[in-house]
Amino acid sequence: MFKGNVQGVGTVENIDKGAKFQSLHGVSLLPIDADLQSHDIIFPEDILEGVTSGELIAINGVRLTVVHTDKSIVRFDINDALELTTLGQLKVGDKVNIEKSFKFGDMTGGRSLSGIVTGVADIVEFIEKENNRQIWIEAPEHLTEFLVEKKYIGVDGVYLVIDAIENNRFCINLLLETDMRWYKKGSKVNIEIPDIAGNW
């Protein structure tokens, strides 16, 4: 589980689209005929400590398993998430949100994200204000019934409050210290609606 508080921003260093499946402790992670990409991500030094193979980490809100580490580079093998999330659209040089899963006893309060993405949505509008940035996001039609004002939603791994809803669009407000500078109109984001996962 994750708190929805991004701990750092990584950079995609390499994408191997012809990757072979890897194993941890002799156990295959994926079926041998699975479509697979390996993503190498440069981690910030302050969150790299203690990262080991087998650890669960959220990348843009998607729960992935570390398969290899080499200095500042952490590798993930990605299978189903290529089609179900935005990870299949990443390019070398892209920025990604990173959060380690919390350990037993670390969680305070009832908020959490599972790292299982509910759908992919589109950023349709940015509104710059004095103390925050307002973002309007267009959700897939089949998820609109689960959108509720003043409830929480995960957007690329960031736990945020839905401030307003218009049809299948919803609005979130970002504090200035929330670093999402590389997002723009037209960007696609992973969303997780905790209500569907039973987290509300």
Curated annotation (Swiss-Prot):
Gene3D superfamilies referenced in this protein's UniProt entry, alphabetically: 2.40.30.20
Keywords for this protein: Cytoplasm, Luminescence, Repeat
Ranges of the Lumazine-binding repeats in the UniProt entry: 1-111, 112-200
Example GO molecular function: riboflavin synthase activity
Main localisation: cytoplasm
Any one biological process term the GO annotation gives: riboflavin biosynthetic process
Subcellular location: Cytoplasm
UniProt KW Translocase keyword: no
Pfam families: Lum_binding (PF00677)
Coiled coil: none
A single cellular component GO annotation: cytoplasm
UniProt cross-references to PANTHER family, sorted A to Z: RIBOFLAVIN SYNTHASE, RIBOFLAVIN SYNTHASE ALPHA CHAIN
Function: Blue fluorescence protein (BFP) that can bind 6,7-dimethyl-8-ribityllumazine, riboflavin, and 6-methyl-7-oxo-8-ribityllumazine as a bound fluorophore. Has no riboflavin-synthase activity.
Quaternary structure and partners: Monomer.
Protein known as: Blue fluorescence protein
Lineage per the UniProt record: Bacteria, Pseudomonadati, Pseudomonadota, Gammaproteobacteria, Vibrionales
Gene that this sequence comes from: Y1-BFP
